[in-house]
Structures are given as C-alpha cells and as structure tokens.
C-alpha cells in the first residue's frame, strides 16, 4: 500500500513552501520504495547528489565568513565534520523529517547505521529539492540554523590530530608539517600506507594503516605525543 505525503507538515518544518510539490515527493522517495511501488516515478538519488553540493557550499560559505583567519586545511576538516552522514542524520532528527521518508518495508528493518545513511540522504535530497524550487537562499535559511554555534564549532577543528599538530607547529615554530606516504603491507599482506610526518626536515612521527588518511592521523598523533607536552 502506497503512503500519502503530508506536504504541508513538511513545509511547516522547513519554513518553506514548494511551488512544485512533486520535487518534495521525489526527495522523500527512497530507492527501495520505488522498487516496491514502480508507480513512483523517480527516487531521491539525483536530488541527493545535488543537495550534497548545496550543503557543502552553504557550510563552506558559513565557515568562511565566521572564521576569517582560518586556513584552508582547518576550514576543510571542519566542514567535513558538519556535512558527514552523522551530521546530516542529526539535522534530519532536529527537523523531525525522518517520519516522512518513503522507504521500502525491507529497508525499515536495517541497522542503526542503515538508518543514519537513509536519514542523511533524505536531508540532502530535500535540500536539493528546495534549491531547485527556490534557489540557494531558502536552502541557506534551512541549513544555517541547524549548524552549531561558533563556540561549539571550534573544538571540531582540534578533533583531528593533523589539525592539532598543524596548530602546534604554527604556534611554536611558525612552520607547517609535511607528510610522506610510502606503500606498506600489514602482517596479513593487506596493502596500506606507511606515512612519515616531518617538521623542519626532521621526522616527528610515523603511522601505519590501510588508508593514507588514517596513517596520516596516526603519524600526527605520534608526533604530538612526543613533542607537545600538553598531550
């Protein structure tokens, strides 16, 4: 049995009225629902793609204006923390949008991780629909109030050891760390990376992991543990 959509209730939560409600219905339609009800003309995946870009732009603009002295690296990492799946899941929860998701019966039995993904995609798809219907301004008016305040955003910059190391070396030595990645294999033969972090040409730390990004974090963490007395 197909479900009906309470468009007015969703518009009230978004504080936005759609000129083309079909866009909203598409944004709510999970691919699993379309598989069960082929009469659903389109699912939300294309709108998710668009909404992801809209979210990234609005958050980037917000951080750029909020922190005029912040460098590109810290801006990038902070943005990542505000646009990832967990963050989008929280935005969906704040707006109570999850109850409107049109999703297949099988998908409803997924794990919590599956729910996070579905709700995150829903938020992005709705942003895509809002953008197509009304432009960037209403999308911005939805996104920005959901973001943490300035004081709450600041700690996000220091969660990543790479950011903490960069801040430490800039403050104490006025230089940036550099990373060198080498191929590496774990004991079971799985490929990965051996990353070394250098400061002023000196080796400060090393990290070994399956992904380059994780190996860089481990190298930065080791560097901090041996050079920053506060850690």
Swiss-Prot record:
<keyword id="KW-0819">tRNA processing</keyword>
<dbReference type="GO" id="GO:0008033">
    <property type="term" value="P:tRNA processing"/>
</dbReference>
<dbReference type="InterPro" id="IPR036389">
    <property type="entry name" value="RNase_III_sf"/>
</dbReference>
<comment type="function">
    <text>Digests double-stranded RNA. Involved in the processing of primary rRNA transcript to yield the immediate precursors to the large and small rRNAs (23S and 16S). Processes some mRNAs, and tRNAs when they are encoded in the rRNA operon. Processes pre-crRNA and tracrRNA of type II CRISPR loci if present in the organism.</text>
</comment>
<feature type="binding site">
    <location>
        <position position="48"/>
    </location>
    <ligand>
        <name>Mg(2+)</name>
    </ligand>
</feature>
<comment type="subunit">
    <text>Homodimer.</text>
</comment>
<keyword id="KW-0507">mRNA processing</keyword>
<dbReference type="GO" id="GO:0004525">
    <property type="term" value="F:ribonuclease III activity"/>
</dbReference>
<keyword id="KW-0698">rRNA processing</keyword>
<feature type="active site">
    <location>
        <position position="52"/>
    </location>
</feature>
<dbReference type="GO" id="GO:0019843">
    <property type="term" value="F:rRNA binding"/>
</dbReference>
<keyword id="KW-0963">Cytoplasm</keyword>
<protein>
    <recommendedName>
        <fullName>Ribonuclease 3</fullName>
        <ecNumber>3.1.26.3</ecNumber>
    </recommendedName>
</protein>
<dbReference type="Pfam" id="PF14622">
    <property type="entry name" value="Ribonucleas_3_3"/>
</dbReference>
<feature type="active site">
    <location>
        <position position="124"/>
    </location>
</feature>
<dbReference type="InterPro" id="IPR014720">
    <property type="entry name" value="dsRBD_dom"/>
</dbReference>
<dbReference type="GO" id="GO:0005737">
    <property type="term" value="C:cytoplasm"/>
</dbReference>
<keyword id="KW-0694">RNA-binding</keyword>
<feature type="binding site">
    <location>
        <position position="121"/>
    </location>
    <ligand>
        <name>Mg(2+)</name>
    </ligand>
</feature>
<feature type="domain" description="DRBM">
    <location>
        <begin position="160"/>
        <end position="229"/>
    </location>
</feature>
<dbReference type="GO" id="GO:0006397">
    <property type="term" value="P:mRNA processing"/>
</dbReference>
<keyword id="KW-0479">Metal-binding</keyword>
<dbReference type="GO" id="GO:0006364">
    <property type="term" value="P:rRNA processing"/>
</dbReference>
<keyword id="KW-0699">rRNA-binding</keyword>
<feature type="binding site">
    <location>
        <position position="124"/>
    </location>
    <ligand>
        <name>Mg(2+)</name>
    </ligand>
</feature>
<dbReference type="GO" id="GO:0010468">
    <property type="term" value="P:regulation of gene expression"/>
</dbReference>
<feature type="domain" description="RNase III">
    <location>
        <begin position="7"/>
        <end position="135"/>
    </location>
</feature>
<dbReference type="GO" id="GO:0046872">
    <property type="term" value="F:metal ion binding"/>
</dbReference>
<keyword id="KW-0378">Hydrolase</keyword>
<dbReference type="InterPro" id="IPR000999">
    <property type="entry name" value="RNase_III_dom"/>
</dbReference>
<comment type="similarity">
    <text>Belongs to the ribonuclease III family.</text>
</comment>
<keyword id="KW-0540">Nuclease</keyword>
<keyword id="KW-0460">Magnesium</keyword>
<dbReference type="GO" id="GO:0003725">
    <property type="term" value="F:double-stranded RNA binding"/>
</dbReference>
<dbReference type="Pfam" id="PF00035">
    <property type="entry name" value="dsrm"/>
</dbReference>
<dbReference type="InterPro" id="IPR011907">
    <property type="entry name" value="RNase_III"/>
</dbReference>
<keyword id="KW-0255">Endonuclease</keyword>
